[in-house]
Structures are given as C-alpha cells and as structure tokens.
Amino acid sequence: MPKLRPGHFYIALLLGAIAATSFAQGAPTFKVDPSWPLEMPNHWIMGAVTGVFVDAQQHVWVTHLPETLTEEELYEQQTPPMATCCKAAPPVLEFDQQGKLVQGWGQGSMTDFTDWPREPHGIFVDHNDFVWVGSYNRHRVMKFTRDGKHLLTLGEYEKTAGSADTKLLGGPSGIWVDPKTNEVYISDGYRNRRVIVFDGASGKYLRHWGAYGNVPDDTERFDPKTMVSGALPKQFSTPHGITGSNDGKIYVADRRGNRIQVFDHHGRFLAERVIAPATLSSGSAFVPVLSPDAQQQWLYVADGTNHKIWILRRSDLEIVGGFGRGGRQLGQMLRPHGMSIDRQGNLYVGEASTGRRVQKFTVQGSAR
C-alpha cells in the first residue's frame, strides 16, 4: 500500500479484513495481564467505562457510568439492602501501577450537577496534575484537583448552541491538554462536529475547526453506507477522541466517520486514514493513543464496534496490525471505549456498554 500523502485519502482496509489480524515486521504485540486491576474495596463495581488515562505517576484514571448498573448488580445499595453485594463505585477512579484502587470521587454527580460532571465521558490528567473530566450528555468539561475539588467549567449544564458557538459545548467526548501551551483541545462531537480549543487556566475560547480544517456545518447529512464505495463525509461525523504528538500534530478519531484525521495546532488539515470502512452502526474510530517512545512510532485506535485495537504506523498512517475480538473472556473486548498507555508501552482498555471493566495489555514487541 502506498504512503499516505497530506490531504489525500483512500480506503485503507478491504471489507473482508475486519476480522483478520496481521503484523508488519517490528510492530508491537500485546498480551493481557490477568492480575490487573486488583479487586476494589467496599464491594464496588464499575458501570460502562467511558474514559481511561495514565498520568505522569503511571496511575490509571477511569471514568464510568454508575447509572448503567442494574438493580440486580446493586442489591447491597438498595434501601434496605437486598443482598451482601454490590455497590456502584464512584464515577472517577484512580488506580496505582499494580491495579490497587487509590481513591474514588464524584459521587455528587448523581445529585449535585453544579460541581460534578454528570454522565462523565473522557478523562485527562495534565502536566500540572489537574484532572479534566467531560460530560457528553450535559455538554461540559470540568477541571479538578487530584482529590476532586472543582476549579473550572467549560460549557454550561445542558446548554448547547451548535458548532459555531464559542461559549457552549455540544457533547464533548475527549480531552487533551498541550503541556507546552496549556491549551485544552476538546473533541466536541456527540452533538457538535468540531475540535474546540480553550486556555487551560482562564477557560478563554481560542479557536475551533471542523473536518479537513474547514468551518463545521451541522446541517450536512451523510449516509455511512456510502463509505463502502469510497465516499467520505465532508464534516466530522462524531469526533470522539483526541490526542497530540511530540512533533505538534493533533490526532482526531472521527468515530462514525471510520477515520483518523491529523491537523497542526491551528487546525490545518494534514492527513487522514480510513479504518474498516464497512463498519456501520457507531463506527470504528473511538480513541487515538500514541506510543511512548520519543518518535511516537505507533498510533493505536480503539474500535468499539469491531471490538478490537488497530495498530497504525504513525509516519504514514499505514495499518500494520491489531488485536482483540468481541467477547467477555479474558483478553477479549466488548465495546472498547476508553484507552491509554503507560511509559512502558502497556495499554489500558476500558469497555463500555455491558463490558464494564478495564483490562491491561502488556506490550511484548517493539513498542518503546
């Protein structure tokens, strides 16, 4: 397959290749770690996982949705208790490297919507140790201290005004903070169709852009079925995850657009890669994660519809492999929806829907 040229697109994967897994020479391989995480205290269990992030201390942060747990799963939590287990864990959780729970907070998200991100979606711990949490269904991104003290809110509770608005958000899904500029990049995509950037200290609006670096248009309608024949949406379909590289590039996972788009920090379009174009439903490109080596050679993409992780070579966005398949057994995945990486190159994958867990995949090959 030829190298990807900036501004050029083509279908990257044949229809029959979705279920196959192959590796280019030197591409990393992974093995599930059955010992991670450890059992949580207090009979706590997770709901659908919506975000995962590994911070500078190599601690793993997780957001999940307690409201997705059923009454049967929460018998101990009923009034009066109906059984000896279980209870919903707080929606924001911090685990150490060994998988032991360090803390959990955010219980107020179920009752107090002023200081907590109800229905959290996406989490990021920045270079100043502040914790950013999104709220996709309530249109806010909120900044906290490590122990959960609320500091700043971007957007307003349950208010949205479209992709042209510079104050309100519309279904924020992913967060990345540039350590050099302290700018907050948000994939604003469950309702809006854009990337939007704010100052991380003041919350001041800075800029935004849509697919291909153009002005976003919320009125465009696109039939995903046409992607099978090579058509691509002119607008973002669902910008769902975002990250930045050491060399100044921004990677956006356009979930229902089945693609990764690459920009510079000002929103100038550089390249894109289509992933599993035959994927309908909710799309193939959920979350982008870069490998921790200095060159950031690999780009990993969580695919919550095909239930796997794709491996791309970052230099040309060539798909060089992948791992995972749908299922509930160890090492299988059901709706991988959040993902992050530690400095050793190990991946942490959080599962939404009824997956409701985080698994650690230890790197075996050359991913550092």
Predicted regions and their residues:
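Eukaryotic scaffold repeat domains enriched in small/polar residues
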Residues: 23-368
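Bacterial N-terminal signal peptides
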Residues: 10-21
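Bacterial N-terminal signal peptides that target proteins for export
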Residues: 1-12
